[in-house]
From Swiss-Prot:
PANTHER family, alphabetized: TRANSCRIPTIONAL REPRESSOR NRDR
Family: Belongs to the NrdR family.
Pfam families cross-referenced by the UniProt entry: ATP-cone, Zn_ribbon_NrdR
Function noted in UniProt: Negatively regulates transcription of bacterial ribonucleotide reductase nrd genes and operons by binding to NrdR-boxes.
Keywords: ATP-binding, DNA-binding, Metal-binding, Nucleotide-binding, Repressor, Transcription, Transcription regulation, Zinc, Zinc-finger
ZnF (unnamed) intervals: 3-34
Gene Ontology MF term list: ATP binding; DNA binding; zinc ion binding
UniProt organism field: Legionella pneumophila subsp. pneumophila (strain Philadelphia 1 / ATCC 33152 / DSM 7513)
Transmembrane portions of the chain: none
Protein name, entry field: Transcriptional repressor NrdR
Domain of life of the source: Bacteria
């Protein structure tokens, strides 16, 4: 692996750990040239289905799009990076488990909402407002009321 600091080819692994419930390997590396240290994350690359967008276009699944959408909803919220990564892994595993070659973006959106509801209710409402295209305050109220009812049912 190339050093991100000096671009030398030779690096050594200083430490390796399983993270995200064993779905990733976190490695601390050290450059043998400049001796800078950096972290890498390793995950198995698996074929994901195409995403069918609302307008009918088909695009490859990009985990970075999933992550950035969730990060936007979670901005300035007390959710750890580890919890976010676990949620992303849960979503991608569910998508893969379905075994379909194509999956509707609405299905992905519902999976994201399920994970955000579990992680942080404010982030859930933020995401829902964009995903469900809220038109006015009544849409927010309706979503919050639904959340309250779900919380009562769980109690």
């Amino acid at each position: 692996m190339y050093c991100p600091f000096c671009h030398a080819e030779e690096t050594k692994v200083v430490d390796s750990r399983l993270v995200a419930d064993g779905a990733q390997v976190r490695r601390r590396r050290e450059c043998l040239e400049c001796h800078e240290r950096f972290t890498t994350f390793e995950t198995a690359e698996l074929i994901m289905p195409l995403i069918i967008k609302r307008d009918g276009r088909r695009e490859p699944f990009h985990i970075d799009n999933l992550r950035s959408g969730m990060l936007r909803a979670l901005e300035k919220r007390p959710v750890s990076v580890d919890d976010l990564e676990k949620a992303i892994i849960s979503i991608t595993e569910e998508i893969r488990r379905r075994g379909e070659r194509e999956i509707d973006s609405q299905v992905v959106g519902e999976l994201v909402m399920k994970e955000l509801f579990r992680l942080d209710h404010v982030a859930y409402v933020r995401f829902a407002s964009v995903y469900k295209r809220f038109k006015d305050v009544s849409d927010f109220r309706q979503t919050i009321d639904q959340m309250k009812n779900e919380d009562k049912e769980k109690s």
